[in-house]
Amino acid sequence: MLHTLSSSPYHADLDTLLRSVDEGDALVLLQDGVIAALAGGDIIHRLLASAVFLYVLRPDTEARGMTEQISNNVALIDYNEFVQLTVEHPQQLAW
């Protein structure tokens, strides 16, 4: 399944999201959701400890001036790669 987080992780039910992901699922952080990928934060550590493949939409990190602060343990992707993930994961859950 493809999960997307588009709101700030401080305004999302992160605990429920983490309980909902299964091994092999993908999570794309976009819009204000990219805040969750900030290096050194508690949120990124919780996400990395889960079984989910973690992706961050690069144009959204660039728009917020955060690209250099994003954890090295996530994959920065562009729109084409995001579309490819939607093809690979026909089921989607938006958070």
Swiss-Prot record:
Q: Which BP terms from GO are recorded?
A: tRNA wobble position uridine thiolation
Q: Which GO terms describe its cellular component?
A: sulfurtransferase complex
Q: Which keywords accompany this UniProt record?
A: Cytoplasm, tRNA processing
Record flagged with keyword Metal-binding: no
Q: Where would you find this protein in the cell?
A: Cytoplasm
Segments spanning the bilayer are none
Where is this protein chiefly located? cytoplasm
> What assembly does the database describe for this protein?
Heterohexamer, formed by a dimer of trimers. The hexameric TusBCD complex contains 2 copies each of TusB, TusC and TusD. The TusBCD complex interacts with TusE.
Q: Which family does it belong to?
A: Belongs to the DsrH/TusB family.
Question: In UniProt terms, what function does this protein have?
Answer: Part of a sulfur-relay system required for 2-thiolation of 5-methylaminomethyl-2-thiouridine (mnm(5)s(2)U) at tRNA wobble positions.
Name of the protein: Protein TusB
